[in-house]
């Protein structure tokens, strides 16, 4: 049983991409799918996965362009396409039905999957993710216009600092009552992947 609790670091070929995922727990246990968000990867769940593995069969993927999954240049980086890559991974691994934990980008990705396969969803935990356009408050209007309505290098420029060290660090520390409890490994890992050629463009896409 102890071996089943160890986190496995695996890859699967999906649509010609090497898709990385973390997996732990007894395959006979209830399944729990962890879908994270910007700017991280399954690395954000590195402590949660082993804490759940004694009760759940846990899986968490890196999306294309994130973490250890391939980042092809010729790829449609949309929530719909990302959801279909994750869906194909779940089919390949037989990982369904499941409980779904989704955070940030995990919301529009996970909700698309369960909309296509409602029988796969047993329960869900929602943390800071959005299901509807109405969930975007007026504070998002400038970003939505810059990227979705009138996208140019000029409209992108004010958003680029969010992909630099201080911006990525802010994702983890903003509003936290004790930032010294947050390991810098988090944003340093994200920055490692963001510094790949073309990675910032992928995130803006």
Where does each model-flagged region fall?
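N-terminal cap/lid subdomain of alpha/beta-hydrolase-fold enzymes
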Residues: 50, 61-64
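A short, Lys/Arg-enriched amphipathic alpha-helix followed by its capping loop at the start of a domain
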Residues: 47-56, 92
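Flexible "cap/lid" subdomain of the alpha/beta-hydrolase fold that forms the substrate-access gate
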Residues: 2-19, 24-27, 31, 39, ...
């Amino acid at each position: 049983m102890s071996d089943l609790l160890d986190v496995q670091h695996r890859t699967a070929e999906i649509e010609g991409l090497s898709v990385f995922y973390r997996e732990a727990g007894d395959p006979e246990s209830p399944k729990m799918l962890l879908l994270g968000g910007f700017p991280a990867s399954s690395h954000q769940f590195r402590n949660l996965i082993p804490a759940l593995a004694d009760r759940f069969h846990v899986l968490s993927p890196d999306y294309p362009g994130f973490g250890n999954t391939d980042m092809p240049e010729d790829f449609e980086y949309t929530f719909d396409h990302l959801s279909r890559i994750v869906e194909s991974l779940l089919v390949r691994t037989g990982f369904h039905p499941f409980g779904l934990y989704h955070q940030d980008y995990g919301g529009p990705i996970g909700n698309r999957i369960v909309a296509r396969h409602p029988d796969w969803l047993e329960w869900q935990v929602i943390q800071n993710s959005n299901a509807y356009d109405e969930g975007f408050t007026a504070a998002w209007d400038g970003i939505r216009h810059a990227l979705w309505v009138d996208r140019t290098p000029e409209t992108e420029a004010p958003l680029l600092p969010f992909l630099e060290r201080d911006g990525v660090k802010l994702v983890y520390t903003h509003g936290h009552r004790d930032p010294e409890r947050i390991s810098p490994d988090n944003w340093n890992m994200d920055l490692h992947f963001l510094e790949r050629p073309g990675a910032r463009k992928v995130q803006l896409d």
